[in-house]
C-alpha cells in the first residue's frame, strides 16, 4: 500500500501530466506555437493515463478523488505559468474541492 505522501505526490504528478498534455495543444491552436508541441502533448497525455493506473483505489473512486487535486494544481498552474493572480474565491473553491477529495480518498477501507 502506498503512503499518503506518495499518493498525494502521485495525484499531483498525474494532474501536471494532464495539464501539460492539454496546455501544449492550446498553445498550438490559440497562441500560434509550433505544431511539433503536439508530440510532447500526446506523450504527456499517455503518461497521464498510465499514472492513473498506479493509484491504489478503484478507477472511478480514483477519478473522483483526483478531481479535487486537479482543481488545486490547475489553479497553481494559472498563477505560476499564466501569471494570473488568484482570488479568494479560487482559494475557497480549491479548499472545498480538496476537502471533498479527502473524504473520498481517506474513507475507511474494509
Swiss-Prot record:
Transmembrane helix recorded as keyword: yes
Subcellular location: Cell inner membrane
InterPro entries: UPF0060
A Gene Ontology term for the protein's cellular component: plasma membrane
Transmembrane portions of the chain: 9-29, 34-54, 64-84, 86-106
Membrane topology listed for this record: Multi-pass membrane protein
Main location: membrane
Keywords in alphabetical order: Cell inner membrane, Cell membrane, Membrane, Transmembrane, Transmembrane helix
Pfam families: UPF0060
Annotated HAMAP family: UPF0060
UniProt cross-references to NCBIfam families, sorted A to Z: PRK02237.1 (NF002586)
Similarity section: Belongs to the UPF0060 family.
The name this protein goes by in its record: UPF0060 membrane protein BTH_I2792
Organism (species): Burkholderia thailandensis (strain ATCC 700388 / DSM 13276 / CCUG 48851 / CIP 106301 / E264)
